[in-house]
Amino acid sequence: YMIDEANIESHGMMFHKDETLANYPDWEVPFMQRMSRMIARDRNYSAIVTWSMGNESGYGKHFETLYDYTKKIDPTRRVQYEGGGYNSKSDIYCPMYARIWRLRQHVNQRDARPMILCEYAHAMGNSVGNFQDYWDLIYKYDQLQGGFIWDWVDQTFAIKDENQRDIWAFGGDMGFVGVVNDSNFCANGLIAADRTPHPHIYEVKKVLQYIHFEPLAFTPNKIKVTNWHDFIGLEGYTLRWAVECDGKTVQDGEMDFPKIAPRHSANIELPLKALPADGKEYFLTLRAFTKHEAPLVPKGHEVAIEQWELPSAPSAKTVQPVEGTLTVDRNNETLTVKGNNFQVA
């Protein structure tokens, strides 16, 4: 599914109602041209489900004109605009970088519109640390419908530094060319400019996986599997499981998933053997892999992973008696306990 966005952005003109271009009469025609030409070009692409009127351009009467025009010529699609906020001229509430409390707030108020974050999870450097917290809410409430990570790829280029080392360059690295640059703020992607994955993309992959695993209480060999796909079952995937202790695999196996319809769950029993009562920690790791090759996805590609500690009986520990006696000294200010080789006051 795609949201098609008009090339309307005037971030530098601020967002005040008296400064935004969206209220300047001279800019009404350019606004309309960019919106109408985009729709005329792309309206027959069925993957487009929503038209966006632009980005970071404040809010003004020109956006109200664009909304009414778009709904008139294409009543089949939704129309959104980030700067519209809770104004009526946006079918979707689509803020950027909303805090998690705002997601809860939207669900709890009476506005029935879906909420989609037009930008969130700013992926610059060691980032997306609270990504799971967002998706715990999104999975919980149908009204919360995801968002768009800013952004996908670092916008940098390869050059040699003064020591002839390869580096990724940005901003002023190209030398003074008479224009303002934003330093390294263009390097905020999930992948590098050469499409090498950054470490934090694996956090995103984990959170967005379509197969979810949960432990079932009091039954360590049974798990709950949820299929979050919209259209397909899990017949095309293989489940591999392993029990690990001290970093070593002590049990493992492979099995097919049962038939689980899209957006449905099922309980699965794993052939786990009883764990020894040795007081050690045992962890169950679950992985799902593709059975067949598909466009862009090879056979055997890992699509989901989960891990949790298994309940196990503690080892019987013998309490060794301690020789010697304790003495207690008490005065008006302190209480002192003394024993062999120690003192506590």
Regions found by a protein language model. Give the residues of each.
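Beta-strand-rich N-terminal accessory domains
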Residues: T285, T290, P314-A345
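Short amphipathic beta-strand/extended segments with alternating polar/hydrophobic composition
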Residues: G253-D256, P298-E302, Q307, N340-A345
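Buried hydrophobic-core signal for structured, non-transmembrane domains
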Residues: M32, K222-H229, L270, L284-A288, ...
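Intrinsically disordered, low-complexity Pro/Gly/Ser/Thr-rich segments with frequent PxxP/GP/PP motifs
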Residues: E244-Y282, A288-F289
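Terminal connector regions
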Residues: A274-A316
